[in-house]
Amino acid sequence: MAIHSRSDALAYQSGFGNQFSSEALPGALPIGQNSPQKHPLGLYAEQFSGTAFTVARSEARRTWLYRIKPSAAHPRYQRMGRQIAGQEQGPINPNRLRWNAFDIPAEPVDFIDGLIPLASTSAADQADGVSVYVYAANTSMQRAFFSADGEWLIVPQQGRLRIITELGLLDIEPLEIAVLPRGMKFRVQLLDSSARGYICENHGCALRLPELGPIGSNGLANPRDFLTPVAWFEDNQQPVELVQKFLGELWSTHLEHSPFDVVGWHGNNVAYKYDLRRFNTIGTVSYDHPDPSIFTVLTSPGAAHGQANIDFVIFPPRWMVAENTFRPPWFHRNLMNEFMGLIDGAYDAKAEGFMPGGASLHNCMSAHGPDNVTAEKAIAAELKPHKIENTMAFMFETGKVLRPSRHALGCPQLQADYDACWNDMTRTFNKEPRR
């Protein structure tokens, strides 16, 4: 197998939403046109569209690929015998739910077989909503994969990953994320003995940076910190399995060439990575706890103006300086639906029970907030400036109800006693105001 790349295969291009271009060999990118009659290197021109042709130019996403064999060169797909087990939506359940960390399998399992379905909003053939998975794997993929159902946001919690994409290579580790466009072929190699993390499959409009409003022209996730691959390709004619996810089902075909044979490309429908440690956190310097929307990294807009199909929000290390304020996240009943995970450390609203690799789900109007231990400490605390360190929690927040999967409601990781953390909330009511 011949592998071709630049001298530094893991160089990246910087920026968000750019019209990127990259070639692994000189002459791979045609000049002045997209689809020449005869490509100088004998490559096929293929357009990879992420939006309809007629959307506003500011919304359009497409990339031109120059590859050794066109993607169309494949035989018929066959439905696979092994599907994503337990992904059917379970019975309606308004309760607050929390899960312990999911185990790494004992037997060899790759990234795709290691998918654990937790929740979804609606059928994947609709142009909105999300599906949420955990992955737990201990073996690198030998096959290739793509999802026709949505864009993938991958959040590692344990173990480093190398993601081979049609556009090049992405290395990510815990505290970094990767985003793969709908339909992009990829393969995941484990750089450690095992890996675990979270996936949000976005069925709606592609993720983008949130508007900053009065914050101004800088802050939150800055565009220059997003990294996109440079061109990299394989030139071989060895058989390889290609799996696609289509309407929630897995289908397979076999290629006689590598699906990662793109020698050059240009466009803005791209894979990218981002280091969450570079997030410019905004918070109060006077009083009260601002709404968590100030921690939004990426957003996919929904049909209702101002209401997201999905917001990806993080709770990173930060200084707490608010005066005369209950500093943890306040008690809340939300129109939106909140799925939370923990990458590292502890979450400041929960003293115990919410561990790295675990998850929680608070659906529309499910009352939630700090547990009793956290609330008692916050009420009694001396309000000196202090820094919350060694933490990284995140939230997938969506305007649609997240229905837990059949697997999520029946697995041993589901905590039967989650509601108990709010039992015996200390009564502090006093008819006479405090002096």
Swiss-Prot record:
<dbReference type="GO" id="GO:0006572">
    <property type="term" value="P:tyrosine catabolic process"/>
</dbReference>
<keyword id="KW-0223">Dioxygenase</keyword>
<keyword id="KW-0408">Iron</keyword>
<comment type="subunit">
    <text>Hexamer; dimer of trimers.</text>
</comment>
<dbReference type="InterPro" id="IPR005708">
    <property type="entry name" value="Homogentis_dOase"/>
</dbReference>
<dbReference type="InterPro" id="IPR022950">
    <property type="entry name" value="Homogentis_dOase_bac"/>
</dbReference>
<feature type="binding site">
    <location>
        <position position="368"/>
    </location>
    <ligand>
        <name>Fe cation</name>
    </ligand>
</feature>
<dbReference type="Pfam" id="PF04209">
    <property type="entry name" value="HgmA_C"/>
</dbReference>
<feature type="binding site">
    <location>
        <position position="332"/>
    </location>
    <ligand>
        <name>Fe cation</name>
    </ligand>
</feature>
<protein>
    <recommendedName>
        <fullName>Homogentisate 1,2-dioxygenase</fullName>
        <ecNumber>1.13.11.5</ecNumber>
    </recommendedName>
</protein>
<comment type="function">
    <text>Involved in the catabolism of homogentisate (2,5-dihydroxyphenylacetate or 2,5-OH-PhAc), a central intermediate in the degradation of phenylalanine and tyrosine. Catalyzes the oxidative ring cleavage of the aromatic ring of homogentisate to yield maleylacetoacetate.</text>
</comment>
<dbReference type="InterPro" id="IPR046451">
    <property type="entry name" value="HgmA_C"/>
</dbReference>
<comment type="similarity">
    <text>Belongs to the homogentisate dioxygenase family.</text>
</comment>
<keyword id="KW-0585">Phenylalanine catabolism</keyword>
<dbReference type="GO" id="GO:0005737">
    <property type="term" value="C:cytoplasm"/>
</dbReference>
<dbReference type="GO" id="GO:0006559">
    <property type="term" value="P:L-phenylalanine catabolic process"/>
</dbReference>
<keyword id="KW-0479">Metal-binding</keyword>
<dbReference type="GO" id="GO:0005506">
    <property type="term" value="F:iron ion binding"/>
</dbReference>
<feature type="binding site">
    <location>
        <position position="347"/>
    </location>
    <ligand>
        <name>homogentisate</name>
    </ligand>
</feature>
<dbReference type="InterPro" id="IPR014710">
    <property type="entry name" value="RmlC-like_jellyroll"/>
</dbReference>
<comment type="pathway">
    <text>Amino-acid degradation; L-phenylalanine degradation; acetoacetate and fumarate from L-phenylalanine: step 4/6.</text>
</comment>
<keyword id="KW-0560">Oxidoreductase</keyword>
<feature type="binding site">
    <location>
        <position position="368"/>
    </location>
    <ligand>
        <name>homogentisate</name>
    </ligand>
</feature>
<dbReference type="GO" id="GO:0004411">
    <property type="term" value="F:homogentisate 1,2-dioxygenase activity"/>
</dbReference>
<dbReference type="Pfam" id="PF20510">
    <property type="entry name" value="HgmA_N"/>
</dbReference>
<feature type="active site" description="Proton acceptor">
    <location>
        <position position="289"/>
    </location>
</feature>
<feature type="binding site">
    <location>
        <position position="338"/>
    </location>
    <ligand>
        <name>Fe cation</name>
    </ligand>
</feature>
<dbReference type="InterPro" id="IPR046452">
    <property type="entry name" value="HgmA_N"/>
</dbReference>
<keyword id="KW-0828">Tyrosine catabolism</keyword>
<dbReference type="InterPro" id="IPR011051">
    <property type="entry name" value="RmlC_Cupin_sf"/>
</dbReference>
